Regions:
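Bacterial N-terminal signal peptides that target proteins for export
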Residues: 1-8
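Bacterial N-terminal signal peptides
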Residues: 9-16
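Terminal leader/tail segments of proteins
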Residues: 21-187
Length: 187
């Protein structure tokens, strides 16, 4: 019986810590005069190690991944690095692999944009760094690190492929995809 109580207490503590971590993502994100609402958030884990937490912010929350990918409207994905094991090269490599998955192996169609992405993500990555990938209609995907603009990549097609890393039918993490589409900040 005490073993069960210990497990329940550990789970309760974990739930509180996870709730607090997601609270750091914030329930909304202000872009200019527009306010985006947190659609859902989750954690990317690999081999039992939490790599980052990510939140999807939309003007009008929805669970329809295809509608989100196709939408030519303001939206954002926020990624907060939670592991000290993430480096610049591993982040870039992971995004490239995710783009290959998202595009069904047709990432070479976005060679120029991927080259731009590598140049934009030039700074080393540290634990607690926050990346915002903000899509602005007619202006492209703006990439911010810790609130500072790093660069932008033009095109709705690239936004679809990039957001597809998390939201396509072949995402980097199916549980994370489900969490980002859940309408809940905590899974």
């Amino acid at each position: 019986m005490s073993k069960i109580c210990s497990w329940l207490a550990a789970f309760a503590l974990f739930s509180v810590l996870v709730s607090q971590a997601y609270a750091e993502l914030g329930p909304q994100l202000k872009i200019g005069e527009q306010v985006l609402k947190l659609n859902g958030a989750g954690t990317r884990t690999k081999t039992f190690v939490q790599i980052y937490e990510s939140g999807l912010y939309l003007l009008n929350p929805t669970k329809d991944a295809r509608a989100i990918l196709d939408a030519d409207e303001l939206m954002a994905i926020r990624v907060r690095i939670t592991s000290g094991f993430v480096s610049r090269s591993s982040l870039v490599s992971s995004l490239q692999e995710g783009l290959a998955q998202s595009t069904g192996g047709r990432a070479d169609e976005f060679a120029s944009e991927i080259d731009q992405l590598q140049k934009i993500l030039k700074e080393e990555v540290k634990r607690n760094d926050v990346y915002d990938f903000v899509y602005v209609p007619e202006k492209g995907l703006h990439i911010l690190k810790n609130g500072k603009v790093q660069g932008a990549i033009q095109g709705l097609a690239f936004k679809k492929a990039f957001y597809g890393v998390w939201l396509s039918d072949t995402p980097v993490d199916k549980d994370l995809r489900q969490a980002m589409l859940s309408g809940n900040a905590v899974r």
